[in-house]
Amino acid sequence: MARLAAFDMDGTLLMPNHHLGHETLATLARLRERDITLTFATGRHVLEMRHILGAISMDAFLITGNGTRIHSQEGDMLHRQDLDPAIADRVLHQAWDTRASMHVFNDNGWFTGSAIPALLQAHVYSGFHYQIVDVKRIPAHQVTKICFCGDHDDLIRLRIQLNEALGERANLCFSAVDCLEVLPLGCNKGSALAVLSDHLGLSLTECMAFGDAMNDREMLESVGRGLIMGNAMPQLIAELPHLSVIGHCRNQAVSHFLTHWLDNPHLPYSPE
């Protein structure tokens, strides 16, 4: 029996309308009744996730910013990792050949250079909002991560540029097909979950995790049971062929799987 369950949010727990379904909430409550510890492992900001937890009255640990921050159920920071200031400065100030928009995150929030209303649709549940600033004036020593949002093919070309400029001094990953993230070296959801499990006195073999994107890869492959969403990025499924694929987030597939796991743990599972 798993003792810790880790959940990605977008494309996993959240439905396509960016809300948590009633079945999902009921199943999470059942896990807590079984004394299974919950953690939400997401690229979203901790300020947003605290609002969501308050809205659903749920106790959970938070892994936010794709592993840059870990917070306890009481809101205490357990772990932090920022971008190397030299890396942040380079990314902020270099002229990149891309049409993608740049988004900068630190403990104070989400910052970008101009309004992009379409991006706010993903935050309708919480009302979390970017702040419009001159991103080049953000102090480099306060940056947790930098994201570029745009066309996937354009982001692939940008990733080549970033790799050439940064080398092995940062982690680059696609948290969605339209979002490329620059993270601190060695920082990902998997490494953060290892820190959290150690804090809780658990081994990763006692954890299960759910995800759909390449920023979930390390987490999914490191736990005792990793589950991939049916709507996952094809690259994730291809790189982790030994992991089970469940249903689509629109059908609250995490709840469907966990209900079976709680009620019939010894029977084979089918997403149908």
UniProtKB/Swiss-Prot annotation:
PROSITE patterns noted in UniProt: COF_1, COF_2
Residues at the catalytic site: 8
EC number: 3.6.1.-
Required cofactor(s): Mg(2+)
An example molecular function term from Gene Ontology annotations: 4-amino-5-hydroxymethyl-2-methylpyrimidine diphosphatase activity
Entry keywords, A to Z: Hydrolase, Magnesium, Metal-binding
InterPro entries per record: Cof, HAD-like_sf, HAD-SF_hydro_IIB, HAD_sf, HMP-PP_phosphatase
Binding, Mg(2+): 8, 10, 212
Metal-binding as UniProt keyword: yes
Reaction it catalyzes: 4-amino-2-methyl-5-(diphosphooxymethyl)pyrimidine + H2O = 4-amino-2-methyl-5-(phosphooxymethyl)pyrimidine + phosphate + H(+)
Function: Catalyzes the hydrolysis of 4-amino-2-methyl-5-hydroxymethylpyrimidine pyrophosphate (HMP-PP) to 4-amino-2-methyl-5-hydroxymethylpyrimidine phosphate (HMP-P).
Family: Belongs to the HAD-like hydrolase superfamily. Cof family.
Name this polypeptide is given: HMP-PP phosphatase
